[in-house]
């Protein structure tokens, strides 16, 4: 029987979402899996320009945009292009945004397990495999596509267990509660000393393209500041940070 792991409540998300943003003319948000990357980009921009940029983190991108829909200070969203396309009512067209780069789907495994590739998930000693919820996390969508295209969905069956976010999947693998899990490169690199290993999956799913897009109701007084931050994201100054977090241009 599949294990359905509880997602964080939207109410808890809301309490985090609008904290500490009152003075900022740019307020950026992202899903749980890329909080550290976005925070690093914001910190670098603040240091280089002395400009104010606020952040609004908490929950998956769907939960966050549900709060944006109800009104709030967020005016720039960073996530994968496929997820952002679902929010055409809240966000401007993707063409108005900035492509940050591509990031691969990763399979990571716990200590005590050895995999030579993702096809080894079908090995007898792999009893439990975790993946993020495909309705809430892009890497869940990518994992679903990969499992289907490779035929592993039928082979693994009920060995696949669902969590709500990439960080949750990673924590289960680190603790050994799951033998393997589908995550992103940020999570895998950040926990490389706590797991058995990881490998990038190159084919079998739609590419994950990280993108920054303004909200549709961007206020006129905030436009110049948001565009300046987006210009930084598109510049070479952001590239080393993106590469560090597994986003490749």
Task: State what each model feature region is.
Residues 18-24:
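Sec/Tat signal peptide C-region and signal peptidase I cleavage site
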Residues 25-50, 54-90, 95-249:
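Exported/periplasmic ABC-transporter solute-binding proteins
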């Amino acid at each position: 029987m599949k294990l359905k792991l509880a997602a964080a409540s939207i109410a808890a998300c809301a309490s985090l979402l609008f904290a500490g943003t009152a003075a900022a003319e740019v307020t950026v948000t992202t899903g749980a899996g890329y909080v550290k990357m976005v925070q690093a980009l914001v910190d670098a921009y603040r240091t280089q320009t002395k400009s104010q940029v606020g952040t609004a983190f908490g929950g998956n991108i769907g939960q966050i945009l549900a709060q944006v829909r109800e009104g709030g200070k967020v005016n720039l969203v960073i996530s994968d292009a496929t997820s952002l396309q679902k929010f055409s009512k809240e966000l401007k067209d993707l063409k108005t945004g900035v492509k940050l780069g591509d990031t691969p789907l990763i399979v990571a495994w716990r200590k005590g397990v050895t995999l030579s590739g993702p096809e080894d998930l079908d090995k007898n000693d792999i009893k439990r495999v975790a993946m993020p919820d495909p309705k809430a996390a892009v890497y869940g969508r990518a994992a679903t596509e990969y499992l289907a295209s490779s035929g592993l969905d039928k082979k693994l069956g009920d060995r696949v267990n669902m969590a709500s976010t990439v960080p949750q999947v990673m924590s289960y693998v680190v603790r050994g509660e799951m033998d393997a899990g589908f995550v992103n490169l940020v999570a895998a690199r950040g926990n490389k000393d706590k797991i058995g290993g990881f490998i990038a999956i190159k084919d079998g799913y739609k590419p994950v393209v990280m993108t920054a897009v303004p909200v549709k109701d961007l206020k006129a007084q905030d436009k110049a500041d948001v565009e300046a931050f987006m210009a930084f994201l598109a510049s070479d100054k952001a590239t080393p940070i993106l590469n560090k977090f597994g986003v490749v241009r």
